Amino acid sequence: MKAQALLLCSLVLLAQSTDVDDEGSGEVFLQKVSSSVSITASLATTMLTSVTNKTTQNVSVTTIDSLSTSPMHNATSNTSYSQTTPYSQTSLSSSVLISTPQMLNSTPNKPLSSTKLTPKSQSSSQSTKTTKQASKNLTTSKLATSFSSTYMTTSDQPYSNNTANKILLNTTYIYLSTLSKITKLFMQEQNKTTQEPFELITPSSTERDSSTLSKHTNKLKPFKPKTQPIVNMQRTWIYPLTGIVSIVVLLIIMSCIHCYIRRFDEHFE
């Protein structure tokens, strides 16, 4: 029944993807690029075993479906599962590969791959082993940018709580150590004080004579404190006063000259 269903699905996809009209009634890619669609479905193996004593069944089906629409994209899926009842458990695994090749020789090849795995459980000892299942681990590298570049790799496989706690402790230790280093450097920079050298002049043992001491004492100038006036008066009134005095003096000089000239004229008349 499953094989018939797969064949019907492949025929429906083939009918929908082909073009009948000359103008094109199906999907048209960029500028009517000729696209070749090939769909293949193959049923690999189908096994059915039954045991009358314990009524166990084991079904192993492997299907490989590939859909390629060149030059746009192609997809391939591989699925394998086994089912045994009632004395064994069920295991299911699937892998999907999606790749996008070069489009019209203009864009670079960008392959995308993703794998989703479910853990396979142990079946009973009397059930037959299924076919080999594809497995792939995904590793992702992450850059931790907390004051220092630290690389961590995590895998998609399940791990225990102990490993998770170890990773958490390692990351917190690295963060705290870098933080403590930065705080130490900051405190050291703040504690630095500027020291200026100074010279202390002291008389040596050879300069204890009175002559040398008198020379040093003569060079010293007596300290005179500056006496500040009690009242600081504003001196802006001096400028108009000087102007008035100068005008009065000029008037006196001119009057004197005028009197002298009048007397001189009277004398010659």
From Swiss-Prot:
Glycans are attached at residues 53, 58, 74, 78, 137, 161, 170, 191. Keywords: Glycoprotein. Residues 76-87, 113-136 have a biased composition (Low complexity). Residues 67-87, 103-137 are annotated as: Disordered. It comes from the Viruses. Signal peptide: none annotated. Residues 103-112 have a biased composition (Polar residues). This is Gene 51 glycoprotein. It comes from Saimiriine herpesvirus 2 (strain 11). The gene is 51.
